[in-house]
Each structure stands twice: as C-alpha cells, then as structure tokens.
C-alpha cells in the first residue's frame, strides 16, 4: 500500500516540500535562515495575536493598554517582549538570508529573489507600523517623520501624506489604520513566503559552490529537518536570552514616555534594523533625493541578477569579490552606527562617504571585480 503522505492531496504537498524534497548534500548553516524566518513569522503572528486581545488602537488608551499588558495580563510582559525582540531576531535572520543570497549567487533564481525583495519591503512596512502602536514618543515622532517623507513626491505628495494620516497630523485615524494594516500584513507575508517557496522548488536549492548539485542530492528529511530544529533551538535560545536578561537593550527609552505632539524628542531615530537606510536618507541634503536614495538602497537588490558579470555563480572561488562583499558588510554596519548618531560633524561626512561607498560597491566595484576575476582565470 502506498504511503498516505504520498497520496493524500494535502499531505503530498507537505511531503514534496519538507520530507522527500531532494536537497544538495553540501548546504551549510547559511541555508538555515529560511526556516528560521518561517519560525520568526509564526512566533510574531502568535505573540501578536495575544497582544491584540488586550491592546486598544486609540490615542487615549494605546499607551495605557501596553502598560496594562505588561503589568496585569498573565505573562503579558513576556509576550510583549518576545514580540518586540522577535522583530529584531526576524531582521537579523533576514539580513543573514539576503547576505547568503548575495554571497553564493542565489539571486540568479530571479523569480525567487524578486519575491524575496517584495517580502523584505513588506516586512519593513509591517515592522514600521508595529513600532507606532505603543504610542510612545518615538512611535509618534517616528510615524510623523517617516510618513512625511512622502510629501517629497512632486505634485501629489502633500495630499498623499494627509490621505495616509486620515487628517492633518498623525492622530487617532492614523493609529487605527496602522493597527489594521499591522494585523493583516503578516498573513500577506505568509502567503508571499509560500510563493517564494513555490518558485524555489521549481529550481531546487543553490549550494555553496554554485555548481549544479543534481548529481548529489539527499532527502530533506531527516538530514535537514534535524539541522533546522537545531537552528530553531539556537534562535529561541538567543531570543529568550534577549527577552529575559535585557528586553529593552534594542528599544528606545523615549518610547516609555507617552506620545506628546507638543514635545519633540532631541534625536528621532527608528529601530536599529532601519538605521542603515535612515543614514542613507539623512546623508542627502535634498528631501526628494534622500527619499529616492532610501528606496533605492533596498530596491537595488532587484538589480543584482543584472549586475552579475562573473562566469562563476558563487563567491566561494572569487577572492576579490569576497573581499568587496565583506567591505560592503562593514559599510552597512558603519551606516547602522551613523543612523543612530546625531546630525553633526564628523557623523555627517562619515554617513555621506559610507552612503557613496554602498552604491559604488554594488553598482561599480563588484561587477568590475567579477570581470577581472574572469580574465585572471583566462575565460
């Protein structure tokens, strides 16, 4: 008799995706982040659901309701901090996942890659809207500053901002709609993630060498299921250390002050995972130019398949490209640091140089290095 997992309409989909899936035998721990992102998403949906049961999306009670969750709801504090720090873990996994894709040339699977970029944008939008919900000082002013950027769009900008706000400033209407969007977006992300997997399973996974692994495949279960479980345990360990020992390490103290439209905080800054893009935005003196640079800093990922000039897929055997890749990582860390600093000398010039380096590395230096490497190999 044929196994039910191979005949049942639902089970055979699960089977072909997670059990009998032929996977390359040499994929390293860098391939764990896909499953970790799935776990992060499930964790965020579950903790978010329980938070939504006690949260009120109204300017007069939002801040108090978050305080109530932390003080009066059974284990509310741990749910709240798991959700807040879960977002940080989500972005750590996202950056690692994208970095892996860049290093090993996974972007040559263009459909999978482009859905991934859309997923990144959707996750960033969700995180931004979630940050507004506690209605602290940084929530309010962050929402004001970031939504105001849309006013840089010629002709329709101002109308667009007022339409998003639902009035003439960030107020009750804004908070209510942000809560509605923040609730629905993770489910859209989950649907997109399934499409992401669907496209991936059309081609199969890449591997560290970037060479076809058709000749050497192993079943996903038990080899990679056990490996993913190990990754998940390490992720949960890291998250719980953060939640239980220093839950406010990555947060902003200003968010423990209720939102006050009459009092601007001295340094308005987003959560740490947006600081690199925020630094690029601030490094351009022109408003529209800054907004374009901000969007392009992420949208540039779409161009990666077009900028691939090497005759090898992976960077595994390309030392010059490897060197530039790690310079890019260092540059992004520099931008992250600058994004959290006040707008004054020497931070302004460092931010501008790091922003120029970011675009220069991706658009010019890395494609040039690939061409040089091709010639060195006499291809």
Swiss-Prot record:
UniProt binding sites for a ubiquinone: 201
Compartments it resides in: Mitochondrion inner membrane
Family matches, as PROSITE patterns: CYTB_CTER, CYTB_NTER
Binding site for heme b b562: 83, 182
Cofactor(s) for this UniProt protein: heme b
Keywords per UniProt: Electron transport, Heme, Iron, Membrane, Metal-binding, Mitochondrion, Mitochondrion inner membrane, Respiratory chain, Transmembrane, Transmembrane helix, Transport, Ubiquinone
GO cellular component, one term: mitochondrial inner membrane
Superkingdom per UniProt: Eukaryota
GO molecular function: metal ion binding; ubiquinol-cytochrome-c reductase activity
Residue stretches spanning the membrane: 33-53, 77-98, 113-133, 178-198, 226-246, 288-308, 320-340, 347-367
Membrane topology: Multi-pass membrane protein
Residues at which heme b b566 binds: 97, 196
GO BP terms, alphabetized: mitochondrial electron transport, ubiquinol to cytochrome c
Family annotation (CDD domains): cytochrome_b_C, Cytochrome_b_N
Cofactor binding notes: Binds 2 heme b groups non-covalently.
Pfam families xrefs: Cytochrom_B_C, Cytochrome_B
Xref: InterPro entries: Cyt_b/b6_C, Cyt_b/b6_C_sf, Cyt_b/b6_N, Cytb/b6-like_sf, Cytochrome_b, Cytochrome_b_C_euk/bac, Cytochrome_b_N_euk/bac, Di-haem_cyt_TM
Stored Gene3D superfamilies: Cytochrome Bc1 Complex, Chain C (1.20.810.10)
Recorded family membership: Belongs to the cytochrome b family.
Subunit details: The cytochrome bc1 complex contains 11 subunits: 3 respiratory subunits (MT-CYB, CYC1 and UQCRFS1), 2 core proteins (UQCRC1 and UQCRC2) and 6 low-molecular weight proteins (UQCRH/QCR6, UQCRB/QCR7, UQCRQ/QCR8, UQCR10/QCR9, UQCR11/QCR10 and a cleavage product of UQCRFS1). This cytochrome bc1 complex then forms a dimer.
Function recorded in the entry: Component of the ubiquinol-cytochrome c reductase complex (complex III or cytochrome b-c1 complex) that is part of the mitochondrial respiratory chain. The b-c1 complex mediates electron transfer from ubiquinol to cytochrome c. Contributes to the generation of a proton gradient across the mitochondrial membrane that is then used for ATP synthesis.
Other observations noted: Heme 1 (or BL or b562) is low-potential and absorbs at about 562 nm, and heme 2 (or BH or b566) is high-potential and absorbs at about 566 nm.
Protein name: Cytochrome b
Species per Swiss-Prot/TrEMBL record: Cephalophus jentinki (Jentink's duiker)
Underlying gene: MT-CYB
